Amino acid sequence: MTKPLQTGMTIPVFPLPTTVFYPGTPLPLHIFEPRYRQMTSDALEGGRRIGMVLLKPNWEENYFGKPQLYSVGCVGNIEKEIKHHDGKYNFTLMGLRRFRIVSEKEGKLYRQAEIELLEEKNEQDIIEGHQNECREKLIENFREFIGYIPQGNPQKKEPSWDLGNKLSEFVDRFAYQLDLSLEQKQNFLEEQDDLKRAKFLHSFLKMKIELIHLSKMHSTQDPRWN
């Protein structure tokens, strides 16, 4: 029986240089390094959980050692795993919870950490048939943004808005679809306050809209859409 996630437990940690992972979102992974094949094998025999964390800048200098990590990551559950004849794996990691690394543990080829689970703050229910101000404002912002994108551009696509029954779920899955920078993604992950995360996404979309307005002031045709 799989133990429930809890503060104080030790989980495998998989650091990557360009990936920030959110609760409620899927992350397809191809595992080929021997140490991470072992990590996957151990996880499948145990709780099927892996913690994703972002490597700090200059990780290249010590990639096969222990490059520095950001302290906040997201733990996910292994789904749809395939083990290939050469020992490599493909699977999808489904995000579960934000966590903070308390301390790293020795004893494995791969990195492990004792974690503290991070609680959501200012959580709100999203009830079908009832408006949620944060949700509606973000949808309005997004529709305004894609309204400026010419027909035929692949970015002019409205997603499904069925992104969860909690505000935390909605903003995390909404952020997953936006072209945030790596730094913005990590800052968003580290923010536990759901309302502050919603406010950040609102500001991000408003900034994108303002950039389009400024561009149109200088040119009748926005070169970013060429």
Where are the language model's segments positioned?
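N-terminal low-complexity, acidic/polar interaction/targeting segments
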Residues: M1-N226
